[in-house]
Amino acid sequence: MSSNQSYVFYRQELNKTLWEVPDRYQNLTPVGSGAYGSVCSSFDTRTALRIAVKKLSRPFQSIIHAKRTYRELRLLKHMKHENVIGLLDVFSPAKSFEEFNDVYLVTHLMGADLNNIVKCQKLTDDHVQFLIYQILRGLKYIHSAGIIHRDLKPSNLAVNEDCELKILDFGLARHTDEEMTGYVATRWYRAPEIMLNWMHYNQTVDIWSVGCIMAELLTGRTLFPGTDHIDQLKLILRLVGTPEPELLQKISSEAARNYIQSLPYMPKMNFEDVFLGANPQAVDLLEKMLVLDTDKRITAAEALAHSYFAQYHDPDDEPIAEPYDQSFESRELDIEEWKRLTYEEVTCFVPPPLDSEEMES
């Protein structure tokens, strides 16, 4: 919005929400809405790209909302990688800080997500290699910035017709207990240590999710479709076996330790039997991802070098991110201060250069 002064805005009501956007963005069509905002597809007349415009819902309603708005903008501005959604534009119709109440974010419009792909077709092993390689390539970048996704699942992975993939909605997920309750996909892909508050978690929570997604791509079935937290844990332990004493000692929650010790002993299943007919290298990688002990779980960078990705792995083309300053996370500010920081981020935004091979869906 650094060039906000050159924007001419127009107004349109969509689904009882007033949208006020620059006239370069035409044909606004609602495509979805959630707790944090609503999204329209649109045509960018300057770049001839189909884009997504997200209007944040009540961005400065409370301190929590205001900090989340600032966090989302900071994260999106930082991400500059082929396999991660990035920011094409950010704007507000406000002409001054005093008028500043609405924030609109512009990203690529992604056609389908991995959920659609899995439902529609049986994937070949080559497809699985390429898709999982791209997820890990994006994760290596995100993790190198010190960011954890926390909510990787098929619906957060956008894919176009050429099988090119981008990771969406990262780093924002701080789900409430309510959202994690019952038969919900939000939890099926969650690492046990984060789902059950076992201990301080690290970036490999995302690797557990990739393992769950990869298993689903190979078999066409959800790996751990638990009906609740306890059922989910039982499904996990049935596959990977009862935790070793060494791991139990690392679980800081005494209640969790006692509960696990009360369960009957379960041996680890043979992954080759579970994933019968799958590429042996795929099975080997799954065994390294679906490890209960986070200290022993493979990292994104290590996984990229696994033999399963031999035809795609290129150490010179798996970039890492610039350092990302997250010191704001520990700051205690009021709404006006978060709003001021957000306003500064909006006004100093510089659009990315247009890539000749822009990813369209």
Curated annotation (Swiss-Prot):
Catalytic activity: L-seryl-[protein] + ATP = O-phospho-L-seryl-[protein] + ADP + H(+); L-threonyl-[protein] + ATP = O-phospho-L-threonyl-[protein] + ADP + H(+)
Domain of life, source organism: Eukaryota
GO cellular component: cytoplasm; nucleus
Binding residues annotated for ATP, in chain numbering: 31-39, 54
PTM sites of type Phosphothreonine: 181
GO term, biological process aspect, one: intracellular signal transduction
Free-text activity regulation comment from the record: Activated by tyrosine and threonine phosphorylation.
Name this polypeptide is given: Mitogen-activated protein kinase 14
Native source organism of the sequence: Xenopus laevis
